[in-house]
Amino acid sequence: HPQAQRTIRRVFRKIAEGGDQVVFSTHSSLLVDVAYFDEIIRMESKCEIVNGKRTAVSKAWQLPMARMIDDLETRFPNLKGKVMPESMRDRYSHAYNPRRNEGFFASKIILVEGLTEEYSLPIYADALPNCTFDPQGISVVECGGKGSMDRLFRIFNELHIPCYILFDYDSGNSDANIINKSKELLALAGESQDTPQTLFVADCIACFLKKWESDLKGEIPDADTLAGEARKELGLSVDSGKPLIARYIARKLIERTPPQVPPSLKTIIEKAVAVKWNKTCLKAKADASVADVSE
């Protein structure tokens, strides 16, 4: 039961705060907390050829708190010596969410801004060859907005989980902070910070020039008609239910013969399914955070 799992998590935390070490293994997203990323050890096992023999090789990935603090202070020199473990946890405390925590157990992650993408992408993926997410261990993680995407990317990436970032660039937005965040995400992925002129798709990141809805509208000729049907069937007002409308449209499109997946989303999904882990994204100096065990 979810309530029991949350209770167990609190009990474990209380025991640990009393000075005893608690070690447990889990596949439950309710028993991990992104704010305590440094206490999570991610185990990965693969079959590899070692000395000519097929061997099970296990790796244990962990992200030390010191590396995250060093990274933050390197990026913001004015914080040098001021970042404590408690304040670092505060930066991530809002992110505790079983759906987001699911990323710790994924083989690959697609980081998205909100529910529109979380609801719709899996539906479109099901209509593409070899792209269904669940059988491949791929999770779509909504970040609660563009502002938190870089933080979650750093955690998941440093645990060696391949991540694909999808966001709205919001070109034309008068809020400089929003545009700066878009540029920051592109830089984080090693891409140019120049404003894209159209849909931008790379090996580990993609962004719509303005927004999901407006950019895809040209690829869905009857988008307005479908949106109207969704509002009528779901009882939504004109300015509400954006994620539900997007999901409705996705379902209607793939029910057609043949299924209709907007070309932009087809390209993005195929890139996301193929994403591979590249390198650390931290500015901090790397240290020992991985152990190899051959069995």
What are these regions (language model features)?
Residues 73-111, 115-295:
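Acidic, Mg2+-coordinating catalytic modules of nucleic-acid enzymes
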Residues 1-86, 90-98, 274, 278, ...:
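Switch/communication elements of ASCE P-loop NTPase nucleotide-binding domains
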